[in-house]
Amino acid sequence: MTATAVKTDYEAIIGLETHCQLNTASKIFCNCSTDFDSPPNTNVCPVCLGYPGVLPVLNEEVLAAAVKLGLAINGQIAPYSKFDRKQYFYPDLPKNYQISQFDLPIVEHGSLEIELVDKKTKEITRKTIGITRLHMEEDAGKLVHAGSDRLAGSTHSLVDFNRTGVPLLEIVSEPDLRTGQEAAEYAQSLRQLVRYLGISDGNMQEGSLRCDVNISVRPVGQKEFGTKVEIKNMNSFSAIQKAIEYEIERQIKAIADGEEIYQETRLWEEGSQRTISMRKKEGSSDYRYFPEPDLPPLEVSEQQKQTWFATLPELPSAKRARYEQKLGLSAYDARVLTEDRDVALYFEEAVNAGADPKAVANWVTQDIAAYLNNNRLTISGLALKPSALAELIDLITKGTISGKIAKDILPELLEKGGSPQKIIEARGLVQISDPDELTAIIQAVIADHPKELEKFRSGKGNMQGFFVGQVMKRTGGKADPKLTNQLIGKLLAQA
């Protein structure tokens, strides 16, 4: 049986567990700072270090963030929930248990729409992914392995407890994902959502967003799930996709070879582009959950929920729909513009200043995006203000300048800002749109090129394009290109 034949006979069942580190100023159960760049073991206190006799106190901002994200994913907010102790021993967990939520999470039964883009056609397919639950918990510390970037090969390990007690939201998806592309897109959509809400920076490199993948394969048409394998250690969206694609191939090959799939945790190795076995996967019974005795149950009133709901911004899916339906943008442009909330706000400011939405979309998604990418900048630091972009588009629309001149002055606007009107006046770049003035210039150009005129008369080559180029050269690109083309066609026909 060929590998291709085997692969088409199976489907992958994929779910993601995503840990989102919140950007609160203090930790979830104490007043210690959450500053990422602090020296090791400086943002600690008896509470987050698990000293005897101390009591945790819930940071209300964590609850607010959980409810807001729950509302954003159309989840059911629990009027009553509680915290639980998750028991396990590891050097980065000083209490030997983690305060989390087990059977009564703050949010259940949500969903998130993802968009899958065809790279060739740019067509978009939408799919809704169910979200089983969202719950609050505290982060563990960070192990630093001396002598190696991994445990294997290191001489000893150091523990930084600064991260202990930093608030996390864990979002557990339904097993609705089928490919690595879908999983990576889901993770990106989740990051986009927490950034729009302002509750996390979603930075995977710093560990603000961490994804664990649960994956199994089964024959197409079979209802029962296969044996689930967990994959960890993916620090980018491309790593999520590659790890899943590798694991699908590995499991299908193992089944085809008559091997057993074990329920285990595997690590993604970026260097070798493969997953390796780490440990046998634990079940919930292994953690011996029981209710946290030092924290009272949580109650969220309808009034509290409505207060937090009123603070939600326009979410990405709503923005995309508005851009398509009211502004007439393509689904692809709407997607690109809403990927980053600051880009969307920039676009909207330019449109509100009077510019045509499609023209603004073209400039933002093409020339401006290229400049930002090449210079590793964000749009919030761009010298070209939205109002100036609207002014530039207006100058083109009115025929004051050509699109070519607009692109010629764009680098200065991007780097230094300023008024497009003042720049073209200072440089003498106002477009020549007077028919009489252009006619005189064209007649002079034709008179200066008798050989080319003869070629035109004999029907050789695209000589009209030659004369347009000569007019543009003589006017320094200031001639109205559309009017120039029309007048040249008319004058050449008469010559």
Curated annotation (Swiss-Prot):
The keyword Nucleotide-binding applies. InterPro entries: Asn/Gln-tRNA_amidoTrfase_suB/E, Asn/Gln-tRNA_Trfase_suB/E_cat, Asn/Gln_amidotransferase, Asn/Gln_tRNA_amidoTrase-B-like, GatB, GatB_C_1, GatB_Yqey_C_2, Gln-tRNA_amidoTrfase_suB_CS. It is an enzyme of class 6 (ligase). Keywords: ATP-binding, Ligase, Nucleotide-binding, Protein biosynthesis. GO terms for biological process: glutaminyl-tRNAGln biosynthesis via transamidation; translation. Belongs to the GatB/GatE family. GatB subfamily. HAMAP family: GatB. Heterotrimer of A, B and C subunits. This is Aspartyl/glutamyl-tRNA(Asn/Gln) amidotransferase subunit B. It comes from Synechocystis sp. (strain ATCC 27184 / PCC 6803 / Kazusa). The gene is gatB.
